Amino acid sequence: MHFAKLDDSPMFRQQMQSMEESAELLRLRCLRFYKGCRKYTEGLGEGYDADIGFVNALESFGGGHNDPVCVAFGGPVMTKFTIALREIGTYKEVLRSQVEHMLSDRLLQFVNGDVHEVKEARKRFDKATITYDQAREKYLSLRKSTRLDVAATIEEDLHSARTTFEQARFHLVSALSNAESKKRFEFLEAVSGTMDAHLRFFKQGYELLHQMEPFINQVLAYAHQSRECANYEMASLNERMQEYQRQVDRETRNSCVSPTGDGMRHNSRNSQKVIEAVMQSAAKGKVQTIRQGYLSKRSSNLRGDWKRRFFILDSRGMLYYYRKPWNWSSGNGSRSVVHRNMASENSPGLLSRWLSSHYHGGVHDEKPVARHTVNLLTSTIKVDADQTDLRFCFRIISPTKVYTLQAENAQDQMDWIEKITGVIASLLSFQTPERAIMRLSTVDGGDTFSASDSGSLADPYDIEQAESGESTVEHPMTGGNRSRFSGCLQQHDMVKTEKPIDVLTRVLGNERCADCGAPEPDWASLNLGVLICIECSGIHRNLGVHISKVRSLTLDVKVWEPSVLTLFQSLGNVYVNSVWEELLNSESRTSSASRSSGTPKSDRPRKLLVRKPGFNDPISVKELFIHAKYSERIFVRKAIDSQHFQAVFQEIWENVRANDKKSVYRHIVCSEADVNALRGQASYTVSLPLSKMMQMEETLEAKFKSIEEEFQENPAGYSNSRGDGESMVREETSNDCSLLHLACLSADIGMVELLLQYGAKINATDSKGRTPLHHCIISRRYAIARLLLMRGGDPNAVDKDSNIPVKYASQTDLNDSELIALLTDSKR
């Protein structure tokens, strides 16, 4: 007890004064402590900003999977590290918020609330004391001769003043007692809670990095191995450069050059056998380079100027050179026309152009371009040029053109002439009449042929493909659905302009925390679909990501994609709580009925002991409730009938088809249904009502009818997509089809997000071997296709027709460069 006696005495007044002085000293201490706490939280905030800045810099440095420079130095590996560092930064921001909420705010509340109330109570007490003293003195100064009515009035004023005085005195006593009582627990609780927040911060950081420890060690081992390989390669390169320099010196000393350059003797008998062996290996599919090097080529224009070009003579008898060998290609002049199995020279549309650049180094190719120059089968070679005063020259004469070339020295001239002569002889000896006619018809006009280099100095396979003019793309791009696709993109852009927290707080129930009712929640659980406060978010994190994936509405900006926002807008805290807390409100009625029917007390569910907390309740109460709600699921109305489990899949199937995300969510939570079950394995064990079967048949017939009507209205624009439309409809009712397949065909992106959040296999295949990504491309649902690719969808998955998704994309009107890049990224 702070006051042994409540009588107004000098001892009582002295005790109150002592407690007021103590409260004032405590106020000063609290203010100093608050300044330190504020400086600490500001430091944590600056630390978080520095962490995010470092992560952003690392992400910018690491680049992406499509950047070959970043891939070369391990950019994708660094991206994995940035995810962990960003998560640690989020932990630090949570720590800052908790320190500010549990310590700084409570200190400020104590100073501005409790201690300030003591001062206000003292002022009211002093004022009441003066009034009471004046009334008492006035009453005591009355004479015996004073009239009774005047004395009664003064006495009544005295009683009123004393009542006010006592109320002010006891109010001051209450304020002092409250401040004195809080000293015993308020600060201990705040500081210990802050230390617990630090414990959770370091524990979460340790666990996250501990999980990454094997990967970090693996990367370090790989880096060490790469360092050793690089050192070995550098030593090998230095040795090769020294050997090359010695060879150049020997060739320079040993070259015999006549004064006019006419002393050459081109005897090819020594190398003829070697050339024939190499030419025979080309018939077996092995292409080798016989000779390569720089030659000066005389232009065929009026000026007849000389240009230095890099020539290659290969084992197929092809002689070609590189234009502008080490310059950047400008404009579209060097754009390749060779499309490896994907696009032809005249294929229109963005897709064919992009695929060409993808296989040959970019639309604006920065590599040299090889030009086919001459058909050696019908050519002869002569020494010297037309003018006899030039040295080291020789001519290649074909029926269509004469090429005048100049070597750098006599030895190179002799070697080129020997090699070309040997190749011509080999071509004449091995060429059949039929093959000769075919080559003449395809190559004699080869002066206009060009091919991009895709790795080495020349890619013989590309050149051979270009000669034969092969291409597998038969359907040019059309613009039938571009307006609808661009409209969808504009809608997504409008959503992106708003902040996620502004979009989601407009949903019913999202203005308060789903678990404790705290106003203005700014955290969320991605898979549960609820908005929660920062205090509950810490509890959710301790549940584990297999139960709740917690993200901030304001900090984790990249998480809030259109698919996630669509899912959250379809659910809301009110509906989600109706699923997870269905038995919470009805349990009181159930318990009353069980008591009236004589149900033993031990049989009552343990949920009677748990109540839903308020936002002012201690964190221990909230933690108990959240664990019971999500981990133990004691408020969920679960399905216990095994036959019910068999029927649930068919209900989920119909809900996905109808794009009813709420019903699908309820089935997943209440029945714990397997979202990866295949329709052929789950639905046929259930006999559906006749009305349901008739409804399904009517839906199927209506879809076929709409396809036929669309074809009749626009047969030309629909010629390429009719087969896809029919297969898409049939696919919905085919066997071995998962819920994700169906969602990609008939639902929106929010339904796909819901299934992915609950573990749907993104690369599951149906009876035709097609993944959901295949169906998205075929049905032109490009937004969902992009989502699947960003979540790990395999762009190289092959169906039973040996087609990958990009093959189907080449037959559609796809003009999204970002999606095309994801589809054609072979490193994914």
From Swiss-Prot:
ANK repeat segments: 735-764, 768-797
Residue span, BAR domain: 1-225
Gene name tied to this protein: AGD1
Keyword tRNA processing in annotation: no
Modified residues (Phosphoserine): S441
Coiled coil: 225-255
Function summary: Probable GTPase-activating protein. Regulator of membrane trafficking. Required for maintaining a straight growth of root hairs.
Region (Disordered): 247-268, 590-611
Key words, A-Z: ANK repeat, Coiled coil, Endosome, GTPase activation, Metal-binding, Phosphoprotein, Repeat, Transport, Zinc, Zinc-finger
SUPFAM superfamilies hit by this protein: Ankyrin repeat (SSF48403), ArfGap/RecO-like zinc finger (SSF57863), BAR/IMD domain-like (SSF103657), PH domain-like (SSF50729)
Subcellular location: Endosome
The protein, known as: ADP-ribosylation factor GTPase-activating protein AGD1
CDD domains on file: ArfGap, BAR_SFC_plant, PH_ACAP
Domain PH as annotated: residue spans: 288-425
Tissue expression remark: Expressed in roots, but not in hypocotyls or cotyledons. Low levels detected in leaf and shoot apical meristems and in siliques.
Domain Arf-GAP: 498-643
